[in-house]
Amino acid sequence: MLPGTSRLPTEASMSWVLLSVLWLIIQIQVIDATLTPELKPHEIVRPKKLPISQKRGLENNQTERYGKEEKYAPEVQYQIILNGEEIVFHLKRTKHLLGPDYTETSYSPRGEESTRHSQDVKPCYYEGHIQNARGSLARISTCDGLRGYFTHRDQRYQIKPLQSTDEGEHAVLPYSWKGQDTVHDKDAEKQVVRKRSHLRTSRSLKNPNEDLLQGQKYIGLFLVLDNAYYKLYNGNVTQMRTFLFKVLNLLNMIYKTINIQVSLVGMEIWSDQDKIKVEPNLGATFTHFMRWHYSNLGKRIHNHAQLLSGASFRHGRVGMAAGNSFCTTSSVSVIEAKKKNNVALVALMSHELGHALGMKDVPYYTKCPSGSCVMNQYLSSKFPKDFSTVSRSHFQGFLSSRNARCLLLAPDPKNIIKPTCGNQVLDVGEECDCGSPEECTNLCCEPLTCRLKSQPDCSEASNHITE
């Protein structure tokens, strides 16, 4: 059951995101976007996989730790030559991309429900940076070649495989969209908030725990895909799932900046027909979804649900969320996901999630290091990977004034899908887990085996657990 109120409030604080119809123009694949004139349209590169150097005097080859059979190591390095310059990606496997109790529900043509617990999701999603390039970022999947995004020297790039192998030919494309950075119309000048009372939990935190402000926080995200979205993929659930996992990888890049780990804990696909009335009126669809969520998903462990719709809504509206609703049963949002690439979709998902976490829209001129703020009132052509000072203040206020303790609920170690030594989580069968050899600072924990060292002071496992 979701933390928070025990019944559905009759009124909810709803935050509208009013964005231009022109936004639809840029919902094409990034590779089709207008390219920066001074750069080559694309460059063909051949990534070279590099061995991970062992630090602290460790001579063991990494295959001893990861095993020869493991295709996707927890840490990898790739080298490419771009514009005559050597670039080395240093990547670490994304942790907890899926929650320990992840389920996937779909329906037969007769309406019969089928739920599976996915245990075989490829662990091929990575995050990291470019070696010796301060401020660089990389989010890349290695499932069938290298595919993803990275930033270098204030330029954004997409890399995609031309062959289904990580060391074959790849295309690297710089991208930006033609026209103004912000896309809007006259009706999208400011955020519209319904004149309804704010959702309240049973009590407020007068003296918030320091963990809420400084500690690691967790979000269990549940995705619902309507029938129109399902049809966009012609019923190919594998293709749809792979795309959404890439989006989730980008979502984590954004929320990692405020110490939040987002895990996908469930997905429901309305493959036979919609379970609510999805209509052009976004507000009405939102109300239908919120009531369906309360009646049908209350017993599934999560703390925010998003409906991704393949339909279009009136007046160019593309998203709606219940503001300040996190840790309540009304923590939901609806997003128009029709024909959006992963960058465009994650921009909307992160924005609406921000509203549920107490963040309001910020003016278009608000500055963020990446050039685009997550909570900007207008969508931008730039990947929004930063929260402004104002948004961080809003979030801190939410943590201080509301019962936001559900953000501290980490996945239960005994339910982790697949034990992985080096993920800093005490999995079943491990005596300790202090991370990779480069990360480990625990003198009693052996990072290669996740076993306690045979030293007199290292006998109590409970004293040497890193979580």
UniProtKB/Swiss-Prot annotation:
UniProt cross-references to PROSITE patterns, sorted A to Z: ADAM_MEPRO, DISINTEGRIN_2, ZINC_PROTEASE
Localization per record: Secreted
Gene Ontology CC entries for this record: extracellular region
Residue span, Disintegrin domain: 418-467
Cofactor(s) needed by this chain: Zn(2+)
Residue positions binding Zn(2+): H351, H355, D361
Pfam families: Pep_M12B_propep, Reprolysin
Active site: E352
SMART domains the UniProt entry points to: DISIN (SM00050)
Its EC number(s): 3.4.24.-
Gene Ontology terms, MF aspect: metal ion binding; metalloendopeptidase activity
Span of the signal peptide: 1-33
Cysteines paired by S-S bonds: C327-C406, C368-C373
UniProt superkingdom: Eukaryota
Domain Peptidase M12B: 217-411
Residue positions the entry lists as glycosylated: N61, N236
Expressing tissues: Expressed highly in uterus during pregnancy.
EC category name: hydrolase
Pro-sequence residue ranges: 34-208
Induction info: Induced by immunization in mature dendritic cells (DC), in marginal zone (MZ) metallophils, in follicular DC (FDC) and tingible body macrophages of germinal center. Down-regulated by steroid hormones and PRL.
Key words of the record: Disulfide bond, Glycoprotein, Hydrolase, Metal-binding, Metalloprotease, Protease, Secreted, Signal, Zinc, Zymogen
Xref: InterPro entries: Disintegrin_dom, Disintegrin_dom_sf, MetalloPept_cat_dom_sf, Peptidase_M12B, Peptidase_M12B_N, Reprolysin_adamalysin
This protein's name: ADAM DEC1
Organism: Mus musculus
Gene name linked to the record: Adamdec1
